[in-house]
Amino acid sequence: MPMILGYWDIRGLAHAIRLLLEYTDTNYEERQYSVGDAPDYDRSQWLNEKFKLGLDFPNLPYLIDGTHKLTQSNAILRYIARKHNLCGETEEEMIRVDILENQVMDVRLAMARICYSPDFEKLKPGFLKEIPEKIKLFSEFLGKRPWFAGDKLTYVDFLVYDVLDMHRIFEPKCLDAFPNLKDFISRFEGLKKISAYMKSSRFLPGPLFMKLAVWGNK
């Protein structure tokens, strides 16, 4: 039985999950829900199913794997990662994984906040000014390691890749001063399964956000 991943028909919070499912060669199917156009942004496609799936906290994304039904994007990532020993092995690695998972969410939410704001154009210059400092912290945390937890790939590499790529789309030169992050991105995109997925018709590079967003909605 394939796992079922449910999410909007956008990149959003499912990007790292899709990448991890592909990397681990997991048998899965997607249920993608669409949102209507302005001004109503009709969500009935999802709302009609929302409370019929047996989810404890009905939301998107969700993952159904037999009797296991999960929501919350990071819980889903961890569930898949545990099956493939991608959560870090030593205490040091697991600490790095835990810190980074939460740091990435903070950075992602800060970006989403301005991209969904009607004051986007007013907020954009201030946001652009903050990007180098945010990116620098990731660069220093990675250091000379190949992956963010250490020598081995973990699920947080999928999260960091996603958030760095989003910032790269927003400001194409934002990684230029950080060669170790550019190398990390090349290393990640060069993984055999990831590279094959990115060339496939299943790959969904965008839109980054929903139609309600001011930026990243196409």
From Swiss-Prot:
InterPro entries per the UniProt record, alphabetical: Glutathione-S-Trfase_C-like, Glutathione-S-Trfase_C_sf, Glutathione_S-Trfase_N, GST_C, GST_mu, GST_superfamily, Thioredoxin-like_sf
Residues that span the membrane, as ranges: none
Main enzyme class: transferase
Organism the protein comes from: Bos taurus (Bovine)
CDD domains associated with the record: GST_C_Mu (cd03209), GST_N_Mu (cd03075)
A GO BP entry: glutathione metabolic process
Function comment: Conjugation of reduced glutathione to a wide number of exogenous and endogenous hydrophobic electrophiles. Protects against the thiol-mediated metal-catalyzed oxidative inactivation of enzymes. Involved in the formation of glutathione conjugates of both prostaglandin A2 (PGA2) and prostaglandin J2 (PGJ2). Participates in the formation of novel hepoxilin regioisomers.
Assembly and binders: Homodimer.
SUPFAM superfamilies assigned: GST C-terminal domain-like, Thioredoxin-like
Amino-acid positions noted as binding substrate in the UniProt annotation, renumbered to this chain: 116
Residue ranges of every copy of the GST N-terminal domain listed in the record: 2-88
Family, similarity comment: Belongs to the GST superfamily. Mu family.
EC code: 2.5.1.18
Predominant location: cytoplasm
Catalytic activity entry: RX + glutathione = an S-substituted glutathione + a halide anion + H(+); prostaglandin A2 + glutathione = prostaglandin A2-S-(R)-glutathione; prostaglandin J2 + glutathione = prostaglandin J2-S-(R)-glutathione; prostaglandin J2 + glutathione = prostaglandin J2-S-(S)-glutathione
Domain of life: Eukaryota
GO cellular component: cytoplasm
Protein keywords: Cytoplasm, Lipid metabolism, Transferase
Pfam family, one: GST_N
Residues holding glutathione: 7-8, 43-46, 50, 59-60, 72-73
Location in or out of the cell: Cytoplasm
Protein's UniProt name: Glutathione S-transferase Mu 1
